Amino acid sequence: MKIYIASPISGLTSEEVFSYYDDIERKLRLCGMKPYSPMTAKHYLRGEMTMNPHGYTHPTSTGHAIYKRDKWMLSNSDVVFVNLLNSATISIGCMFELAWADMLGKHIVVVSNGEPPYNHAFIKQAADIIFTSLDDALEYLQELAHCDFVS
């Protein structure tokens, strides 16, 4: 099963971003899933103090490259996992990813605490399932893949 991982990036430190994506990707791979990550081929950003939504010139991080690659990865996934917890700011990228996933008929699993700014009718209607905790969402994905996560 292929799964696209979406989570707010802008405003977070590179350590926060890479730590999250590395951990989630590892757990999903242990269940035999193939994770698609917006951080693919961006390891050179590990030293960034704060992640920005624009202004990068590296070929894999131009606005066009990010938009097209993330859209391609999402369109080739079976499940889209959107974690809206711990965001530093509203994520326009995540909202695009959620909209693309809905338009493409993907199975959408969202994690949100249900508070503003993500307590919104569009998110609630686009999501197939909304969890309030990351652990509960991962447990569901584990059951969907018929396996147990190994820490």
Which residue stretches match the model-derived regions?
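Conserved catalytic or regulatory cores that recognize and/or transform ribose-phosphate-containing ligands
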Residues: 1-151
